[in-house]
From Swiss-Prot:
PANTHER family: ESTERASE ALNB, ESTERASE OVCA2. Phomoidrides A and B (also known as CP-225,917 and CP-263,114) are potent inhibitors of Ras farnesyltransferase and squalene synthase. CP-225,917 and CP-263,114 inhibit Ras farnesyl transferase from rat brain with IC(50) values of 6 uM and 20 uoM, respectively. CP-225,917 inhibits squalene synthase with an IC(50) value of 43 uM and CP-263,114 with an IC(50) of 160 uM. One of its GO terms (cellular component) is nucleus. This is Hydrolase phiM. The active site is at residue 87. InterPro entries: AB_hydrolase_fold, FSH-like_dom, LovG.
């Protein structure tokens, strides 16, 4: 069974080279085991470095542009079996998948699985500078297998668990590590991620 072809979306204030380094132990093991191969998409929205939930998708126009850019890239370079997003890359991924399903009812989703690392569901910033989850949009999340890797000390931990619960119409697994808003390369966590990818690959092959 061929490995999954995965497209990776980096987070706020980051880039593809940083994300490659952050995911290095994970992608190395998955490649060695023939489970998945990875490609990287550079973001087009300038942002400040560091964690945070403001400053990226502050208006409807920037959200639409980011989703359109991702859809265009997939049409030109796909198909991909799955898409992986870290931090704001996860938010874009969730936004894109829900919006695509809402605009194209009955169509196949643009990928067959999704991986969210330290993710936040689609949201808009409230007047108090706190994210307001767009539950109406989340209702359109496609029925595809998802993997959620979250940090128990992450400032978005609560939002990450909301995202996982909102995608549970299909197979959705949660892997929690003891760190914060970062990609954990703890050997035990890396092995768990490898196992989850293997399970997703089997489910995709079986069409469930």
């Amino acid at each position: 069974m061929p490995g999954l072809r995965i497209l990776c979306l980096h987070g706020q204030g980051s880039n593809t080279e940083i994300m490659k380094a952050q995911l290095g132990p994970i992608t190395k093991l998955l490649k060695q085991n023939g489970v998945a191969t990875f490609e990287w998409l550079e973001g087009t929205i300038p942002t400040e470095a560091g964690p945070g939930v403001s400053g990226v998708f502050e208006d409807e126009q920037s959200i639409r542009e980011a989703c359109e850019d991702l859809e265009d890239y997939l049409e030109e370079n796909g198909p991909y079996d799955g898409i992986l997003g870290f931090s704001q890359g996860s938010t874009l991924l969730a936004e894109f998948l829900c919006d695509f399903a809402r605009r194209n009812p009955g169509n196949e989703p643009p990928c067959r699985c999704a991986i969210f690392m330290n993710g936040i569901p689609p949201y808009r910033m409230g007047d108090d500078e706190k994210p307001i989850i767009d539950y109406g949009l989340l209702e359109h999340f496609p029925s595809i297998p998802t993997l959620h890797v979250v940090g128990k000390k992450d400032f978005v931990y609560e939002y990450s668990t909301i995202l996982q619960a909102s995608t549970a119409s299909a197979w959705a697994t949660l892997i929690a590590h003891e760190k914060g808003h970062e990609i954990s390369n703890d050997t035990r966590i890396v092995q768990k991620i490898n196992s989850a990818f293997e399970q997703m690959s089997i489910r995709i092959a079986l069409g469930c």
